[in-house]
Amino acid sequence: MIILNLFELLKQIQVSPGLYLGRPAVTDLFIFLNGYEFARSQSNVDLTPQEERFYDEFQPWLQRKLGVMSVTSWAKLIMLSCHDEKTGFDRFFQLLDEFNQESIADSLMAA
Protein backbone atom coordinates (compact mmCIF):
# COMPACT_ATOMS: atom_id res chain seq x y z
CA MET A 1 0.00 0.00 0.00
CA ILE A 2 1.33 3.42 -0.96
CA ILE A 3 0.74 6.02 1.72
CA LEU A 4 -0.12 9.34 0.16
CA ASN A 5 -0.46 11.70 3.11
CA LEU A 6 -0.04 12.13 6.83
CA PHE A 7 -3.57 11.05 7.70
CA GLU A 8 -3.31 7.81 5.72
CA LEU A 9 -0.02 7.17 7.50
CA LEU A 10 -1.66 7.82 10.88
CA LYS A 11 -4.38 5.29 10.05
CA GLN A 12 -1.70 2.70 9.33
CA ILE A 13 0.15 3.55 12.54
CA GLN A 14 -3.06 3.21 14.55
CA VAL A 15 -3.64 -0.27 13.12
CA SER A 16 0.00 -1.44 13.29
CA PRO A 17 1.94 0.74 15.73
CA GLY A 18 4.68 -1.85 16.17
CA LEU A 19 5.54 -1.67 12.50
CA TYR A 20 6.19 2.08 12.64
CA LEU A 21 6.99 2.89 16.26
CA GLY A 22 8.03 -0.38 17.87
CA ARG A 23 5.24 -0.01 20.44
CA PRO A 24 2.02 1.98 20.81
CA ALA A 25 3.35 5.02 22.66
CA VAL A 26 2.22 8.63 22.27
CA THR A 27 5.73 9.97 22.89
CA ASP A 28 7.16 7.71 20.19
CA LEU A 29 4.37 8.81 17.85
CA PHE A 30 5.21 12.47 18.51
CA ILE A 31 8.89 11.87 17.70
CA PHE A 32 7.99 9.86 14.59
CA LEU A 33 5.69 12.61 13.28
CA ASN A 34 8.34 15.26 13.84
CA GLY A 35 10.77 13.11 11.86
CA TYR A 36 8.17 12.62 9.13
CA GLU A 37 7.67 16.39 8.82
CA PHE A 38 11.44 16.95 8.76
CA ALA A 39 11.98 14.29 6.09
CA ARG A 40 9.28 15.82 3.91
CA SER A 41 10.84 19.27 4.21
CA GLN A 42 14.33 17.92 3.43
CA SER A 43 12.92 16.16 0.36
CA ASN A 44 11.13 19.34 -0.77
CA VAL A 45 7.75 17.62 -0.49
CA ASP A 46 5.23 20.22 0.57
CA LEU A 47 2.68 19.44 3.23
CA THR A 48 -0.95 19.52 2.15
CA PRO A 49 -3.14 22.25 3.68
CA GLN A 50 -4.68 19.62 5.99
CA GLU A 51 -1.25 18.44 7.11
CA GLU A 52 -0.11 22.03 7.72
CA ARG A 53 -3.27 22.58 9.77
CA PHE A 54 -2.41 19.56 11.94
CA TYR A 55 1.19 20.64 12.51
CA ASP A 56 0.25 24.30 13.12
CA GLU A 57 -3.04 24.02 14.99
CA PHE A 58 -3.29 20.69 16.82
CA GLN A 59 -1.23 21.71 19.86
CA PRO A 60 -2.97 25.11 20.36
CA TRP A 61 -6.34 23.37 19.92
CA LEU A 62 -5.35 20.75 22.50
CA GLN A 63 -4.21 23.42 24.95
CA ARG A 64 -7.59 25.16 24.66
CA LYS A 65 -9.45 21.86 24.99
CA LEU A 66 -7.53 20.83 28.11
CA GLY A 67 -7.36 24.33 29.57
CA VAL A 68 -3.57 24.10 29.82
CA MET A 69 -1.23 26.81 28.63
CA SER A 70 2.20 25.30 28.08
CA VAL A 71 5.02 25.21 25.57
CA THR A 72 5.37 21.47 26.07
CA SER A 73 4.61 18.99 23.29
CA TRP A 74 1.12 17.75 22.53
CA ALA A 75 2.30 14.28 23.58
CA LYS A 76 3.16 15.55 27.06
CA LEU A 77 -0.17 17.40 27.23
CA ILE A 78 -1.97 14.15 26.45
CA MET A 79 0.09 12.28 29.03
CA LEU A 80 -1.11 14.69 31.75
CA SER A 81 -4.37 12.73 31.79
CA CYS A 82 -3.15 9.25 30.85
CA HIS A 83 -1.54 6.69 33.12
CA ASP A 84 0.64 5.08 30.45
CA GLU A 85 1.98 5.56 26.92
CA LYS A 86 -0.48 3.08 25.35
CA THR A 87 -3.45 4.95 26.83
CA GLY A 88 -1.90 8.19 25.57
CA PHE A 89 -1.49 6.65 22.12
CA ASP A 90 -5.17 5.65 22.02
CA ARG A 91 -6.21 9.05 23.39
CA PHE A 92 -4.25 10.83 20.64
CA PHE A 93 -6.38 9.19 17.96
CA GLN A 94 -9.59 10.11 19.78
CA LEU A 95 -8.41 13.71 20.03
CA LEU A 96 -7.26 13.72 16.40
CA ASP A 97 -10.73 12.61 15.27
CA GLU A 98 -12.30 15.37 17.36
CA PHE A 99 -9.83 17.95 16.01
CA ASN A 100 -10.54 16.91 12.42
CA GLN A 101 -14.31 16.96 12.96
CA GLU A 102 -14.15 20.47 14.42
CA SER A 103 -11.92 21.60 11.56
CA ILE A 104 -14.39 20.24 9.00
CA ALA A 105 -17.27 21.96 10.78
CA ASP A 106 -15.32 25.23 10.89
CA SER A 107 -14.57 24.95 7.16
CA LEU A 108 -18.23 24.36 6.35
CA MET A 109 -19.32 27.32 8.45
CA ALA A 110 -16.77 29.57 6.74
CA ALA A 111 -17.98 28.57 3.27
Model-based region annotation:
Residues 8-13, 92-95, 99:
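C-terminal ligand-sensing/allosteric alpha-helical core of TetR-family HTH transcriptional regulators
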Residues 25, 72-75, 106-111:
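Short glycine-rich, low-complexity/disordered patches
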